[in-house]
C-alpha cells in the first residue's frame, strides 16, 4: 500500500485515544493541587472579587464574569504546570 497525502499515514484515521475516567479524575485532582500550590487559585479568586466589587454584584452575571476571567486565568497558568500536565496526559494516553 502506498502512503500519500490522500490516504494518510494512520492505520485507522477514525481512532482517537481517550482517557479512562480514573485517569481523568486523577489528572483533575493533580491540576487542582498544582494550581493551589503555585497561588494561581488564590489569584483568580481575588480577580473575581475585584471585578464583582467594581461592577457590582447585581450588574454582572456568571457568563459575563466567565467571559472576562477565563482568558486571563488561562494565560496565568504557569508553564511548569502546563508542561507537567501535558506529560501526565501523554503518559495516561500511552497506557
Swiss-Prot record:
InterPro entries found in the cross-reference section: TF_ENY2, TF_EnY2_sf
One Pfam family hit: EnY2
Coiled coil: none
One Gene Ontology cellular component: nuclear pore
GO terms assigned for molecular function: chromatin binding; chromatin insulator sequence binding; transcription coactivator activity
A GO biological-process term: regulation of transcription by RNA polymerase II
Domain of life of the organism encoding this protein: Eukaryota
Tissue expression from the record: Expressed specifically in testis.
Protein family (similarity comment): Belongs to the ENY2 family.
Function of the protein: Testis-specific paralog of the ubiquitously expressed transcription and mRNA export factor e(y)2. Cannot functionally replace e(y)2.
Protein name: Enhancer of yellow 2b transcription factor
Originating gene: e(y)2b
